[in-house]
């Protein structure tokens, strides 16, 4: 399969949302930028923090939308149109309620699973669902009525450490992820649990 040219980390802007569960995707991009010595800068035309980096010899774009989560598609659409990137070459990194903290799962395509950021991205990419997803586990609060409050809060210290460990572990495979070697990554990453 073709690799990924645009890596998008979802989150909400502002210091009040920093290190909340919902910002796990943005944390992943920030960690990759540090690891790659890439400076993310505010880019108005892309509605987010943006940077260019070489990974596995390929030029890739890093994006953290600075819209709110439910408007993330606007930023993804802007970068895709400007650089002519098809949805299949986009990887969205996001928090995932359905897997526990300390785990991360990679897949190509799929639905939105109730995630408002994914829902908006699908809508802005003309209902194309074929972009990749790296799902960072944050766990579930137990009842659907608690989800909105849960994702906007900081994780307990033990869970936060596990989320960071899953981010670090998944970053070990970034070269293979960018190259599109998803099966190789899945075989390793899906067995990891912090």
Swiss-Prot record:
Keywords: Cytoplasm, Hydrolase, RNA-binding, tRNA-binding
Record: active site: 22
Site entry (Stabilizes the basic form of H active site to accept a proton), positions: 95
Cell cycle keyword on record: no
InterPro entries: Pept_tRNA_hydro, Pept_tRNA_hydro_CS, Pept_tRNA_hydro_sf
Top-rank taxon, per record: Bacteria
Site (Discriminates between blocked and unblocked aminoacyl-tRNA): residue numbering on this chain: 12
Record-level GO BP terms: protein quality control for misfolded or incompletely synthesized proteins; rescue of stalled ribosome
Statement: the UniProt record of this protein carries the keyword Cytoplasm: yes
Localization: Cytoplasm
GO molecular function list: peptidyl-tRNA hydrolase activity; tRNA binding
Catalysed transformations (reactions): an N-acyl-L-alpha-aminoacyl-tRNA + H2O = an N-acyl-L-amino acid + a tRNA + H(+)
Binding annotation for tRNA: 17, 68, 70, 116
Role summary: Hydrolyzes ribosome-free peptidyl-tRNAs (with 1 or more amino acids incorporated), which drop off the ribosome during protein synthesis, or as a result of ribosome stalling.
Xref: HAMAP family: Pept_tRNA_hydro_bact
Family membership: Belongs to the PTH family.
Assembly information from the UniProt record: Monomer.
UniProt-recorded name of the protein: Peptidyl-tRNA hydrolase
